[in-house]
Amino acid sequence: MSEAFMGSGRLPAAFMSPGPTSFVDFLRQVSPDRLPNFANLPSDSSPAHLTPEATTIVAVVFSGGVVLAGDRRATSGNVIANRDMDKLFRTDEFSAVGIAGSAGIGIELAKLFQVELEHYEKREGRPLSLEGKANRLATMIRSNLGLAMQGFVVVPLLVGYDTSRGEGRIFSYDPVGGCYEEHRYHAIGSGSVYAKGALKKLYRDDLAETDAALVALQALYDAADDDSATGGPDLHRKIYPLVDVITEDGHRRMSHEEVESLAQTVVAARAEHPDGPTAPVS
């Protein structure tokens, strides 16, 4: 334990005075040993077997907000490491993150980001703007650059409802912390190429919430159809993708029953048309 916490048992002075708005910066000053630290990994280590890979995440903007959906599969090489992983994280009332890449590090990053936003709101008395959240996450990803260069790459997808603009927004990242706003829809992970093809074909500007969720599930189904690392609906085990919805009313996770109904609609339609719904030529 850090020396800052040893002694009389009372909180050190740093905890009793105004500090940085970033929880990560505060912890780095007061007790850096409590931050995730993998700096001493050997440079010639092979990380592939150490942590499963989280795979495909999609996001779709609709008229009242934004939908974030993720498949449940995690892989380790050619092995299915987990069939029911949760890759979506509510980060505050109006934002959420989906992770692809090194699962263990991605989950820790998402949870630390949750604390980061909570710390800022307590410290400042107001939440960060959505763009502020996007930039703060970019800084945290950048601090993972050393690990990314050793193969532990984490690529999150941030979505949120911008209360100042009254719309859903999507932000993607590269492994070195570059932040890019995406418009209408986006996908990340091993199946993202196939998911984006479906999103491009099915997206409409006037989508309602349920339709946006259905489009996201169709995109994940297409990804699973061509990418073995992406899991499709598992009807026998009743394992379905997870879907988060963020609107002016805040964040909510669609219930298992809601997603099950939508997933069964997708699967039933695929029995008739295995390649999925078609888009008009003109």
Curated annotation (Swiss-Prot):
<dbReference type="InterPro" id="IPR001353">
    <property type="entry name" value="Proteasome_sua/b"/>
</dbReference>
<comment type="similarity">
    <text>Belongs to the peptidase T1B family.</text>
</comment>
<comment type="pathway">
    <text>Protein degradation; proteasomal Pup-dependent pathway.</text>
</comment>
<dbReference type="GO" id="GO:0004298">
    <property type="term" value="F:threonine-type endopeptidase activity"/>
</dbReference>
<dbReference type="InterPro" id="IPR000243">
    <property type="entry name" value="Pept_T1A_subB"/>
</dbReference>
<keyword id="KW-0068">Autocatalytic cleavage</keyword>
<feature type="propeptide" description="Removed in mature form; by autocatalysis">
    <location>
        <begin position="1"/>
        <end position="54"/>
    </location>
</feature>
<comment type="function">
    <text>Component of the proteasome core, a large protease complex with broad specificity involved in protein degradation.</text>
</comment>
<keyword id="KW-0378">Hydrolase</keyword>
<dbReference type="GO" id="GO:0019774">
    <property type="term" value="C:proteasome core complex, beta-subunit complex"/>
</dbReference>
<keyword id="KW-0647">Proteasome</keyword>
<protein>
    <recommendedName>
        <fullName>Proteasome subunit beta</fullName>
        <ecNumber>3.4.25.1</ecNumber>
    </recommendedName>
</protein>
<keyword id="KW-0865">Zymogen</keyword>
<dbReference type="InterPro" id="IPR029055">
    <property type="entry name" value="Ntn_hydrolases_N"/>
</dbReference>
<keyword id="KW-0963">Cytoplasm</keyword>
<dbReference type="GO" id="GO:0019941">
    <property type="term" value="P:modification-dependent protein catabolic process"/>
</dbReference>
<keyword id="KW-0888">Threonine protease</keyword>
<dbReference type="InterPro" id="IPR022483">
    <property type="entry name" value="PSB_actinobac"/>
</dbReference>
<dbReference type="GO" id="GO:0005737">
    <property type="term" value="C:cytoplasm"/>
</dbReference>
<feature type="active site" description="Nucleophile">
    <location>
        <position position="55"/>
    </location>
</feature>
<keyword id="KW-0645">Protease</keyword>
<dbReference type="Pfam" id="PF00227">
    <property type="entry name" value="Proteasome"/>
</dbReference>
<dbReference type="InterPro" id="IPR023333">
    <property type="entry name" value="Proteasome_suB-type"/>
</dbReference>
<comment type="subunit">
    <text>The 20S proteasome core is composed of 14 alpha and 14 beta subunits that assemble into four stacked heptameric rings, resulting in a barrel-shaped structure. The two inner rings, each composed of seven catalytic beta subunits, are sandwiched by two outer rings, each composed of seven alpha subunits. The catalytic chamber with the active sites is on the inside of the barrel. Has a gated structure, the ends of the cylinder being occluded by the N-termini of the alpha-subunits. Is capped by the proteasome-associated ATPase, ARC.</text>
</comment>
<dbReference type="GO" id="GO:0010498">
    <property type="term" value="P:proteasomal protein catabolic process"/>
</dbReference>
